[in-house]
Protein backbone atom coordinates (compact mmCIF):
# COMPACT_ATOMS: atom_id res chain seq x y z
CA UNK A 1 0.00 0.00 0.00
CA UNK A 2 2.82 2.35 0.81
CA UNK A 3 4.38 1.62 -2.54
CA UNK A 4 1.12 2.27 -4.33
CA UNK A 5 0.65 5.50 -2.39
CA UNK A 6 4.17 6.54 -3.27
CA UNK A 7 3.62 5.72 -6.95
CA UNK A 8 0.29 7.53 -6.92
CA UNK A 9 1.84 10.54 -5.23
CA UNK A 10 4.61 10.61 -7.77
CA UNK A 11 2.11 10.25 -10.59
CA UNK A 12 0.00 13.04 -9.10
CA UNK A 13 3.01 15.23 -8.60
CA UNK A 14 4.15 14.76 -12.18
CA UNK A 15 0.94 16.10 -13.73
CA UNK A 16 0.94 18.91 -11.21
CA UNK A 17 4.45 19.90 -12.20
CA UNK A 18 3.53 19.61 -15.86
CA UNK A 19 0.45 21.74 -15.29
CA UNK A 20 2.50 24.34 -13.47
CA UNK A 21 5.01 24.38 -16.30
CA UNK A 22 2.17 24.69 -18.82
CA UNK A 23 0.72 27.57 -16.83
CA UNK A 24 4.10 29.28 -16.82
CA UNK A 25 4.40 28.57 -20.53
CA UNK A 26 0.93 30.01 -21.03
CA UNK A 27 1.90 33.09 -19.09
CA UNK A 28 5.10 33.52 -21.06
CA UNK A 29 3.40 34.08 -24.42
CA UNK A 30 1.23 36.74 -22.79
CA UNK A 31 4.33 38.56 -21.66
CA UNK A 32 5.92 38.33 -25.10
CA UNK A 33 2.69 39.49 -26.72
CA UNK A 34 2.54 42.57 -24.53
CA UNK A 35 6.21 43.46 -25.05
CA UNK A 36 5.38 46.88 -26.58
CA UNK A 37 2.63 47.62 -24.05
CA UNK A 38 2.72 48.43 -20.37
CA UNK A 39 3.50 45.33 -18.23
CA UNK A 40 0.63 43.93 -16.18
CA UNK A 41 2.06 42.84 -12.86
CA UNK A 42 -1.25 41.75 -11.37
CA UNK A 43 -1.88 39.20 -14.09
CA UNK A 44 1.57 37.63 -13.76
CA UNK A 45 1.32 37.31 -10.00
CA UNK A 46 -2.18 35.85 -10.22
CA UNK A 47 -1.01 33.23 -12.75
CA UNK A 48 1.91 32.20 -10.56
CA UNK A 49 -0.37 32.05 -7.51
CA UNK A 50 -2.82 29.80 -9.38
CA UNK A 51 0.02 27.45 -10.43
CA UNK A 52 1.34 27.33 -6.87
CA UNK A 53 -2.16 26.60 -5.55
CA UNK A 54 -2.59 23.73 -8.02
CA UNK A 55 0.78 22.23 -7.04
CA UNK A 56 -0.10 22.52 -3.35
CA UNK A 57 -3.44 20.76 -3.94
CA UNK A 58 -1.71 17.87 -5.74
CA UNK A 59 0.87 17.54 -2.96
CA UNK A 60 -1.87 17.47 -0.32
CA UNK A 61 -3.70 14.72 -2.20
CA UNK A 62 -0.51 12.68 -2.42
CA UNK A 63 0.18 13.13 1.28
CA UNK A 64 -3.30 11.98 2.22
CA UNK A 65 -2.81 8.77 0.26
CA UNK A 66 -6.04 9.11 -1.78
CA UNK A 67 -5.02 10.03 -5.28
CA UNK A 68 -8.22 10.44 -7.23
CA UNK A 69 -7.90 9.89 -10.95
CA UNK A 70 -9.14 13.41 -11.98
CA UNK A 71 -7.21 15.40 -9.42
CA UNK A 72 -4.22 16.21 -11.59
CA UNK A 73 -6.37 16.92 -14.67
CA UNK A 74 -8.62 19.29 -12.68
CA UNK A 75 -5.58 21.04 -11.24
CA UNK A 76 -3.99 21.38 -14.69
CA UNK A 77 -7.21 22.67 -16.23
CA UNK A 78 -7.65 25.16 -13.38
CA UNK A 79 -4.14 26.49 -13.83
CA UNK A 80 -4.50 26.72 -17.60
CA UNK A 81 -7.91 28.42 -17.30
CA UNK A 82 -6.54 30.90 -14.77
CA UNK A 83 -3.60 31.73 -17.01
CA UNK A 84 -5.86 32.11 -20.04
CA UNK A 85 -8.24 34.27 -18.00
CA UNK A 86 -5.34 36.47 -17.00
CA UNK A 87 -4.28 36.85 -20.61
CA UNK A 88 -7.86 37.59 -21.68
CA UNK A 89 -8.50 40.02 -18.83
CA UNK A 90 -5.35 42.03 -19.51
CA UNK A 91 -6.19 44.91 -21.90
CA UNK A 92 -4.18 44.65 -25.06
CA UNK A 93 -2.33 47.93 -25.60
CA UNK A 94 -2.10 49.29 -29.12
CA UNK A 95 1.31 47.81 -29.82
CA UNK A 96 1.10 48.59 -33.51
CA UNK A 97 0.46 52.31 -32.91
CA UNK A 98 0.96 54.23 -36.12
CA UNK A 99 3.46 57.01 -35.71
CA UNK A 100 3.69 59.50 -38.56
CA UNK A 101 7.01 59.89 -40.23
CA UNK A 102 8.90 63.15 -39.71
CA UNK A 103 8.36 64.29 -43.30
CA UNK A 104 4.70 63.24 -43.67
CA UNK A 105 1.54 64.69 -42.17
CA UNK A 106 -0.98 62.70 -40.15
CA UNK A 107 -3.69 61.23 -42.35
CA UNK A 108 -7.34 62.03 -41.65
CA UNK A 109 -10.35 59.78 -42.28
CA UNK A 110 -11.43 59.66 -45.94
CA UNK A 111 -14.83 61.20 -45.21
CA UNK A 112 -13.55 64.28 -43.36
CA UNK A 113 -11.26 66.71 -45.21
CA UNK A 114 -8.48 68.42 -43.35
CA UNK A 115 -8.48 71.97 -42.04
CA UNK A 116 -5.25 73.88 -42.22
CA UNK A 117 -3.95 75.64 -39.17
CA UNK A 118 -0.54 76.62 -37.91
CA UNK A 119 1.68 77.03 -34.89
CA UNK A 120 4.60 79.31 -34.13
CA UNK A 121 7.66 77.43 -32.89
CA UNK A 122 10.59 79.78 -32.44
CA UNK A 123 11.06 81.74 -35.64
CA UNK A 124 9.23 79.32 -37.96
CA UNK A 125 5.63 78.82 -38.94
CA UNK A 126 4.47 75.22 -39.23
CA UNK A 127 1.19 73.97 -40.60
CA UNK A 128 -0.72 70.87 -39.55
CA UNK A 129 -3.95 69.19 -40.53
CA UNK A 130 -7.10 68.98 -38.48
CA UNK A 131 -10.30 67.17 -39.46
CA UNK A 132 -13.25 69.57 -39.32
CA UNK A 133 -15.25 68.58 -42.40
CA UNK A 134 -14.26 71.77 -44.23
CA UNK A 135 -12.77 71.70 -47.71
CA UNK A 136 -9.60 73.66 -46.93
CA UNK A 137 -6.12 73.01 -48.11
CA UNK A 138 -3.41 71.82 -45.78
CA UNK A 139 -1.21 74.83 -46.37
CA UNK A 140 -3.99 77.35 -46.91
CA UNK A 141 -2.62 79.64 -44.24
CA UNK A 142 0.99 78.53 -44.53
CA UNK A 143 3.45 81.26 -45.40
CA UNK A 144 6.94 82.45 -44.64
CA UNK A 145 8.29 82.79 -41.06
CA UNK A 146 6.34 85.25 -38.93
CA UNK A 147 3.37 84.78 -41.24
CA UNK A 148 0.68 87.31 -40.45
CA UNK A 149 -2.08 89.34 -41.98
CA UNK A 150 -1.77 93.06 -41.42
CA UNK A 151 1.17 92.53 -39.06
CA UNK A 152 -0.62 90.15 -36.66
CA UNK A 153 -0.68 86.32 -36.50
CA UNK A 154 -3.58 84.62 -38.16
CA UNK A 155 -4.27 82.05 -35.48
CA UNK A 156 -4.40 84.75 -32.78
CA UNK A 157 -7.17 86.79 -34.32
CA UNK A 158 -8.91 84.45 -36.78
CA UNK A 159 -11.62 82.21 -35.42
CA UNK A 160 -10.85 78.77 -36.87
CA UNK A 161 -13.99 77.27 -35.34
CA UNK A 162 -16.07 79.78 -37.29
CA UNK A 163 -14.59 78.47 -40.53
CA UNK A 164 -15.77 74.98 -39.70
CA UNK A 165 -19.42 76.05 -39.62
CA UNK A 166 -19.46 77.18 -43.25
CA UNK A 167 -18.28 75.30 -46.28
CA UNK A 168 -15.52 77.25 -48.02
CA UNK A 169 -13.95 75.99 -51.25
CA UNK A 170 -10.27 75.25 -51.06
CA UNK A 171 -9.33 77.61 -53.86
CA UNK A 172 -10.99 80.61 -52.18
CA UNK A 173 -9.13 80.41 -48.87
CA UNK A 174 -5.97 82.31 -49.89
CA UNK A 175 -8.03 85.01 -51.57
CA UNK A 176 -10.30 85.41 -48.56
CA UNK A 177 -7.38 85.40 -46.17
CA UNK A 178 -5.86 88.34 -48.03
CA UNK A 179 -9.09 90.31 -47.82
CA UNK A 180 -9.23 90.13 -44.02
CA UNK A 181 -7.47 92.99 -42.26
CA UNK A 182 -6.83 93.72 -38.61
CA UNK A 183 -6.69 96.91 -36.61
CA UNK A 184 -4.07 97.19 -33.95
CA UNK A 185 -6.56 98.26 -31.30
CA UNK A 186 -9.31 95.80 -32.23
CA UNK A 187 -9.37 92.08 -31.69
CA UNK A 188 -11.97 91.18 -34.31
CA UNK A 189 -11.30 91.18 -38.04
CA UNK A 190 -13.22 93.35 -40.42
CA UNK A 191 -13.87 93.03 -44.12
CA UNK A 192 -11.77 95.49 -46.12
CA UNK A 193 -13.55 97.21 -49.00
CA UNK A 194 -11.12 98.67 -51.54
CA UNK A 195 -11.77 102.23 -52.66
CA UNK A 196 -13.24 103.42 -49.36
CA UNK A 197 -11.64 105.18 -46.43
CA UNK A 198 -11.31 103.02 -43.33
CA UNK A 199 -13.29 104.77 -40.64
CA UNK A 200 -14.68 103.57 -37.32
CA UNK A 201 -18.35 104.31 -36.83
CA UNK A 202 -19.09 106.26 -33.65
CA UNK A 203 -22.85 105.80 -33.83
CA UNK A 204 -24.64 102.63 -32.88
CA UNK A 205 -27.09 100.81 -35.10
CA UNK A 206 -30.13 102.17 -33.28
CA UNK A 207 -28.83 105.65 -32.46
CA UNK A 208 -30.20 108.35 -34.79
CA UNK A 209 -27.80 110.78 -36.36
CA UNK A 210 -28.69 114.45 -36.18
CA UNK A 211 -26.99 116.38 -38.96
CA UNK A 212 -27.57 120.11 -39.20
CA UNK A 213 -27.32 122.07 -42.42
CA UNK A 214 -24.71 124.73 -41.74
CA UNK A 215 -24.49 127.41 -44.39
CA UNK A 216 -21.26 129.08 -45.35
CA UNK A 217 -20.67 132.76 -44.93
CA UNK A 218 -22.38 134.70 -47.70
CA UNK A 219 -24.21 131.66 -49.10
CA UNK A 220 -27.81 132.49 -50.04
CA UNK A 221 -29.59 129.30 -49.02
CA UNK A 222 -33.08 130.26 -50.21
CA UNK A 223 -34.45 126.73 -50.33
CA UNK A 224 -33.09 125.71 -46.95
CA UNK A 225 -33.99 128.88 -45.09
CA UNK A 226 -37.53 129.73 -46.14
CA UNK A 227 -38.53 127.77 -49.23
CA UNK A 228 -39.51 129.10 -52.66
CA UNK A 229 -42.94 130.33 -51.55
CA UNK A 230 -41.66 132.61 -48.80
CA UNK A 231 -40.37 136.17 -48.89
CA UNK A 232 -36.94 136.87 -50.29
CA UNK A 233 -34.27 139.14 -48.90
CA UNK A 234 -34.38 142.14 -51.20
CA UNK A 235 -31.52 144.38 -50.15
CA UNK A 236 -29.76 145.99 -53.09
CA UNK A 237 -26.27 145.36 -51.81
CA UNK A 238 -26.43 142.28 -49.61
CA UNK A 239 -23.67 142.42 -46.98
CA UNK A 240 -21.30 139.47 -47.11
CA UNK A 241 -20.93 137.48 -43.94
CA UNK A 242 -24.14 138.80 -42.41
CA UNK A 243 -25.31 137.13 -39.24
CA UNK A 244 -28.68 136.48 -40.86
CA UNK A 245 -27.25 133.71 -43.06
CA UNK A 246 -25.38 131.88 -40.34
CA UNK A 247 -28.41 129.75 -39.57
CA UNK A 248 -30.38 127.76 -42.12
CA UNK A 249 -33.45 127.03 -40.04
CA UNK A 250 -36.56 129.28 -40.05
CA UNK A 251 -36.81 129.24 -36.27
CA UNK A 252 -33.35 130.75 -35.89
CA UNK A 253 -33.85 133.68 -38.32
CA UNK A 254 -32.54 136.95 -36.92
CA UNK A 255 -34.88 139.88 -37.52
CA UNK A 256 -32.43 142.64 -36.73
CA UNK A 257 -32.38 144.29 -40.16
CA UNK A 258 -33.03 148.04 -39.98
CA UNK A 259 -35.54 148.15 -42.85
CA UNK A 260 -37.49 145.06 -41.74
CA UNK A 261 -37.87 143.90 -45.34
CA UNK A 262 -36.59 140.37 -44.89
CA UNK A 263 -39.90 138.71 -45.73
CA UNK A 264 -41.00 141.20 -48.42
CA UNK A 265 -41.16 140.32 -52.08
CA UNK A 266 -40.38 142.98 -54.70
CA UNK A 267 -39.54 146.60 -53.87
CA UNK A 268 -37.84 147.82 -50.77
CA UNK A 269 -39.86 149.78 -48.27
CA UNK A 270 -40.51 153.33 -49.48
CA UNK A 271 -38.64 156.06 -47.68
CA UNK A 272 -40.31 159.51 -47.90
CA UNK A 273 -38.21 162.42 -49.04
CA UNK A 274 -37.61 165.41 -46.82
CA UNK A 275 -39.01 168.86 -47.48
CA UNK A 276 -35.63 170.23 -48.53
CA UNK A 277 -35.16 167.41 -51.02
CA UNK A 278 -38.66 167.90 -52.46
CA UNK A 279 -38.14 171.67 -52.73
CA UNK A 280 -34.89 171.23 -54.68
CA UNK A 281 -36.48 168.65 -57.00
CA UNK A 282 -39.55 170.85 -57.63
CA UNK A 283 -37.39 173.85 -58.50
CA UNK A 284 -35.40 171.85 -61.04
CA UNK A 285 -38.60 170.37 -62.47
CA UNK A 286 -40.09 173.81 -62.89
CA UNK A 287 -37.07 174.84 -64.91
CA UNK A 288 -36.99 171.72 -67.09
CA UNK A 289 -39.12 168.56 -66.97
CA UNK A 290 -36.28 166.54 -68.43
CA UNK A 291 -32.80 166.37 -66.99
CA UNK A 292 -29.50 165.49 -68.55
CA UNK A 293 -26.53 163.69 -67.06
CA UNK A 294 -24.79 166.76 -65.64
CA UNK A 295 -27.97 168.11 -64.08
CA UNK A 296 -28.74 164.68 -62.54
CA UNK A 297 -25.32 164.56 -60.91
CA UNK A 298 -25.69 168.07 -59.52
CA UNK A 299 -29.17 167.36 -58.05
CA UNK A 300 -27.93 164.08 -56.56
CA UNK A 301 -25.11 165.89 -54.79
CA UNK A 302 -27.40 168.66 -53.53
CA UNK A 303 -30.18 166.41 -52.21
CA UNK A 304 -27.99 163.52 -50.96
CA UNK A 305 -29.90 161.09 -53.21
CA UNK A 306 -28.68 158.61 -55.78
CA UNK A 307 -28.82 159.41 -59.50
CA UNK A 308 -31.31 156.61 -59.99
CA UNK A 309 -33.61 158.05 -57.35
CA UNK A 310 -33.45 161.46 -59.04
CA UNK A 311 -34.27 159.93 -62.42
CA UNK A 312 -37.22 157.95 -61.02
CA UNK A 313 -38.60 161.02 -59.25
CA UNK A 314 -38.57 163.04 -62.45
CA UNK A 315 -40.37 160.21 -64.28
CA UNK A 316 -43.04 159.97 -61.60
CA UNK A 317 -43.43 163.73 -61.59
CA UNK A 318 -44.11 163.83 -65.35
CA UNK A 319 -46.71 161.03 -64.98
CA UNK A 320 -48.42 163.04 -62.24
CA UNK A 321 -48.60 166.09 -64.51
CA UNK A 322 -50.21 164.02 -67.23
CA UNK A 323 -52.88 162.81 -64.83
CA UNK A 324 -53.61 166.37 -63.71
CA UNK A 325 -53.90 167.56 -67.29
CA UNK A 326 -56.20 164.67 -68.19
CA UNK A 327 -58.47 165.44 -65.24
CA UNK A 328 -58.69 169.13 -66.25
CA UNK A 329 -59.69 168.10 -69.76
CA UNK A 330 -62.39 165.88 -68.41
CA UNK A 331 -63.80 168.63 -66.21
CA UNK A 332 -63.82 171.17 -69.06
CA UNK A 333 -65.48 168.81 -71.46
From Swiss-Prot:
GO cellular component, one term: nucleus
GO molecular function, one term: DNA binding
Family: Belongs to the Abd-B homeobox family.
The organism of origin for this protein: Carollia perspicillata
Signal peptide feature range: none
Protein's name in the database: Homeobox protein Hox-D13
SMART domains: HOX
InterPro entries referenced in this protein's UniProt entry, alphabetically: AP_axis_regulatory_Homeobox, HD, Homeobox_CS, Homeodomain-like_sf, HoxA13_N
Ranges for region Disordered: 1-24
Record lineage: Eukaryota, Metazoa, Chordata, Craniata, Vertebrata
Function: Sequence-specific transcription factor that binds gene promoters and activates their transcription. Part of a developmental regulatory system that provides cells with specific positional identities on the anterior-posterior axis.
Keyword Disulfide bond listed: no
Amino acid sequence: MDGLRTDGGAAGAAPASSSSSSSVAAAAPGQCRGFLSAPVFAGTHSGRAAAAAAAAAAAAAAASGFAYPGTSERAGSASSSSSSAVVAARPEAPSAKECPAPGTAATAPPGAPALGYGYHFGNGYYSCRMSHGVGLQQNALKSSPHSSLGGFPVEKYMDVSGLASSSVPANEVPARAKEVSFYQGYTSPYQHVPGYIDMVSTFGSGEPRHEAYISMEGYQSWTLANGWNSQVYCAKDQPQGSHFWKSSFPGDVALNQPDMCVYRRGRKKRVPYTKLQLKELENEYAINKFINKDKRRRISAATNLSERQVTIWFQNRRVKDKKIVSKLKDTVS
